[in-house]
Amino acid sequence: MRPIRLVAAALSLTFAGPSFGWIEYQSQADHFSINFPDEPEVRDIEYLTEQFLTLPARLYSYEDGPSRYSMTVVDFSNTEQMHAERLANCEAELGGGDSCNNPWSTELRGAMVHAAWNLMQRAAQVTHFSYYFSDLVEGQRLHLTNADGSRTYAAIHMHENLLYIMEGTVPAGAPEPALFQQSLGFIDEAGDRIRYRSIYTNGFPPPPSFTYQ
């Protein structure tokens, strides 16, 4: 993945009750912006795909008492080449046929579904699962009730072959983490936020867009 450069800007937010300071956090390496309670921890990790590729990924996370916030970004840009290398000897070993077809396009198109499936396998009850979009980048949204009564609010998107998995978990009885949930944006190389004029679907030509700061 690309070298990481990060930008964080302070937000001043007021509630009916205590006042909390959040930041608008940007990762120019992974082309997104999102609100966190404070600077998140960033770790390089690995991600196993549905077709058993191990891809480079990055985990951005922050714990605020019993509440947890995270963004996982997985780089799918080299999946075609990686599958081709894995199938290099397929015809000689298996004699060709469907077993030797490169599944990279299926891998890309199914990435969000597989990520949602992984969330559903947790020891939690799924209470909501729907189509969703953020800044007109399409995705999926899930709500889960965990064994301890806490609630996880997750959203999954794919933009320019990067898979984004965001999760906000709050204690039982706490309100939804709206400041986190509703803040996701996608940014260009200059750090400007991209806004599409119609729905963006990964793998298809992007619709017209404009940028703003």
Predicted regions and their residues:
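Short, solvent-exposed coil/turn segments at beta-strand boundaries
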Residues: 35-39, 64-67, 136-137, 157-164, ...
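Bacterial N-terminal signal peptides that target proteins for export
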Residues: 1-8
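Short N-terminal segments immediately surrounding and downstream of signal-peptide cleavage
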Residues: 21-39
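Conserved polar/disulfide-associated segments of primarily extracytoplasmic proteins
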Residues: 48-151, 155
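Surface-exposed amphipathic alpha-helical segments
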Residues: 40, 93, 109-122, 160-213
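A mature extracytoplasmic/lumenal domain signature
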Residues: 29, 38-40, 46, 75, ...
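Hydrophobic helical h-region of N-terminal Sec-dependent signal peptides
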Residues: 9-13
